[in-house]
Amino acid sequence: MKFVDDLYRYEGESAKLKLVQFRNVLFVPPIQYIYFFRKLQNSRFIITRIFLLCVFRFLQYLYNIQIPYQTKIDKGFRILHYGTIVVNPNTIIGKNFNIAQGCLIGFAHGKREGVPTIGDNVVMGANSIIVGG
């Protein structure tokens, strides 16, 4: 996925402008996280991956967001408010997904064992929990 597809959810048509992209990556914490999330997913060279992984790990601790870069999230990903967001790396998420602070998407044991698959156009409000397959 491309970062511009995610930024479109924040900025609309102006997301294609390089100045708007630059401004948001510098000053908007959720967009910084999404930018490095997408860059790390799409990086091919080992040196680039190591650098991006270091920055990504720093942002995870800084903003308290734990969405591993292995997580499959389609275009239109939006973090509404950052802080205490945890997602299982095996989760599959569809298009236009919004997530707020205090959310958890995790693995469950028992009858509904597994990891959730979340469809398109889903909004997870504050302090929501989705577990199981």
Regions found by a protein language model. Give the residues of each.
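Terminal amphipathic alpha-helical/low-complexity segments used for targeting or macromolecular assembly
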Residues: 1-63
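Context-gated lysine
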Residues: 2, 16-18, 39, 72-75, ...
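Left-handed beta-helix
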Residues: 68-69, 74-75, 80-89, 94-95, ...
